[in-house]
UniProtKB/Swiss-Prot annotation:
HAMAP family: Ribosomal_uL29. SUPFAM superfamilies: Ribosomal protein L29 (L29p) (SSF46561). Pfam families: Ribosomal_L29. Keywords: Ribonucleoprotein, Ribosomal protein. The lineage of its organism: Bacteria, Bacillati, Bacillota, Bacilli, Bacillales. This is Large ribosomal subunit protein uL29. Signal peptide: none annotated. It comes from Bacillus anthracis. GO terms for cellular component: cytosolic large ribosomal subunit.
Length: 66
């Protein structure tokens, strides 16, 4: 999800998506540990998506408009 798309969401929607992505990341790490992970780059993608969403939320908290 692109940053501009994230900025169009409400803060509550972003928090919901972050929670879902954290669950997915947990499952991906579990698969990695058990040797069942087919796409290891997905871990990186999910981590970066979480970071983007948290950045947008933080921008809103401190009043940065982009």
């Amino acid at each position: 999800m692109k940053t501009n798309d994230i900025r169009e969401l409400t803060t509550a929607e972003i928090e919901t998506k972050v929670k879902a992505l954290k669950e997915e990341l947990f499952n991906l790490r579990f698969q990695l540990a058990t040797g069942q992970l087919e796409n290891p780059t997905r871990i990186r993608e999910v981590r970066k998506a979480i970071a983007r969403m948290k950045t947008v939320v933080r921008e809103r908290e401190i009043g940065i408009n982009r």
